[in-house]
Amino acid sequence: MKSFQAAALAILACCLPAFPNSTAQEAGAGQFQIPASDDGLPGAGPIRRYPWFQNLWQIKRSGWAKRVEADKGAVVFLGDSITQGWGDEMGGSFPGVKVANRGISGDTTRGMLIRLQEDVLSLQPEAVVLLMGTNDLEEKASPETIAANLKLILAELSKHDPEMPVVLSLVFPSSASKSRPAEAIKKINQLYREVVKAEKQVTVVDTWTLFANGDGDAKKEEFPDLLHPNAEGYALWAAALRPVLATLGFLETEPDDFQNEEGFVSLFNGEDLTGWGFREKKSLKPIKNFDGEQASDDGRYVAINGRLVVTTPPEGRRIQQLWTTAEFPTDFTLKLEFRATPNADSGIFIRRPQLQCRDYLLAGPYKNLERYKPQDWNEVVVEVRGGQARCTCNGEVLEAEFKVPATGPIGLEGDRGQMEYRRIRLRED
């Protein structure tokens, strides 16, 4: 990033490695020089060759080359200055997770493609987290070119290990004043989603909606220069990634030890999908149950350490429902907790009608909740009396008189993003 030149030079001053002699220094620098010409290089679009960027590229990469063995098996974060600025340990945001930061300030998608093998794949990563594309815009690359480079990167990651999880953060909002207008970023993200539609290996996290203001630009309180996040911005990014990393098995690996209140019975045992299944959409006639199975046959619903996870569909949105095999004709109180990734859309079916369960502040419809905790656990309580239900989230009323039929099952919808449910319990009243 041109505007980041001064900071990059400061990084150079403090990060220069100590070589025993000038010959070693020249060899180290030469190994990671940016090719003088684009001829024969993979991908398309800009490769930056400003002197400050070439120096930073060489210093960062020669330093990483000495850490290959130490960083093997890490979750690797690949990106530009936004990633680099998070620090070597990603700000301590993922306790217990071995991480490796491979962000270089100013880098483009093509630059990341060129260095992918040495900087990322040589580490035999357990997973890769991607954030890329904003610098390409400053260099006047088209959204189509940027998305094509992402496609090549994903192909290389899949070729290396088709089972390795890849998490794609959508390009953060910025500003036209930074040569990164909202419409161009939205177009890139649209194309990114199209690229990964059939990629089961890739989980998309909607970090654009997370950060965008009403005009689609970055917010000053999170991006003071309208490009780089401050501590608050990084905290929001970390919170958006943590649920996905938990689903992938890197965080929250211990079972939930919650004990039900007296009179409540668990509808979900925390270990598998016993008591849950698919039903015919119109009649709600049971068509398949998953007793003893950890996941539904399509992998959308998964039991993980006490959490019933509705995973992010590769195609971006896929509407379906998982239902209890039991039905509930009497008055009851249903309690559960949910956690949503940014802009996630799900729902809780009460005998049949759907109570919207979403990342409310972004996805609605209850955008004015004061106690809702984004990307954290929130409690929903549904009290059914006669033909009506009173529904609350963290004690705030969602629906005071929600009409429900005389009997029916409890259901959980999958739509957009990842939604987790836990501590699902019911008391007949």
Set out the residue ranges of the language-model regions.
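Catalytic His-Asp segment of secreted/periplasmic serine-dependent ester chemistry enzymes
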Residues: P173-E252
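Carbohydrate-interacting regions of secretory-pathway proteins
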Residues: K151, A198, L251-D429
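N-terminal secretory targeting modules
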Residues: M1-F77, T83-D88, G92-S93, L123, ...
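Structural recognition of the beta-strand scaffold that forms the well-ordered cores
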Residues: A74-L78, V99-G103, A127-M132, P165-L170, ...
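Oxyanion-hole/transition-state-stabilizing segment in secreted/luminal serine hydrolases
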Residues: T83-A100, T109-K151, E156, V167, ...
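Acidic/histidine-rich helix-loop elements
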Residues: L41-Q54, G87, P95-G111, E138, ...
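Charged, glycine-enriched surface loops/patches
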Residues: A147-S169, K187, L191-V202
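Solvent-exposed loop/turn segments at secondary-structure junctions
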Residues: S81-G85, S105-T109, T134-E139, F172-A176, ...
